[in-house]
Amino acid sequence: YQKTLIETGHPKRGDIVVFKYPEDPKLDYIKRAVGLPGDKVTYDPVSKELTIQPGCSSGQACENALPVTYSNVEPSDFVQTFSRRNGGEATSGFFEVPKNETKENGIRLSERKETLGDVTHRILTVPIAQDQVGMYYQQPGQQLATWIVPPGQYFMMGDNRDNSADSRYWGFVPEANLVGRATAIWMSFDKQEGEWPTGVRLSRIGGIH
């Protein structure tokens, strides 16, 4: 992906943010800030849709939900391939393929628009993929797949939803880890050096980072 860093203050909901990965601060990640401090974030792994309720500090009733809307699901221009190398290591790659063509061992990704309040962006999903919800970060006192963002922290998600290791799996990003805002995230995904564009290792959470 291409990214242009912009000086960051407090990210707004929907901003694309570059930050130090909390579990390994040597790594920079780029994700979208979907949850701000005090937000209650719920993700439905079946419909792959978000519910966001602002102003839900612990122990406080929160009834108002942020308007979150989705366009119809459509085929995207991208195909994701899956294969195994000698020795059984699973790899994956992304290719731009005309909609009237197919690719061996490939699955065409779906695309739709997600609107968080007044911010609209495109997201990608893999039609056959389901999150391993049991690997989600479970916040103490909250149901699985529901998180209340603590003060001074943020809930980040990738737009390439089924190929993103993000706050669903490892929790919140402290404000101190923020590096800057960015202008592009489309088709980015977490990777190890040297593994793009030939493929990426399947992560321990069962998706592609």
Per-region residue spans from a language model:
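Soluble "head" domains of membrane/secretory-pathway proteins
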Residues: 1-209
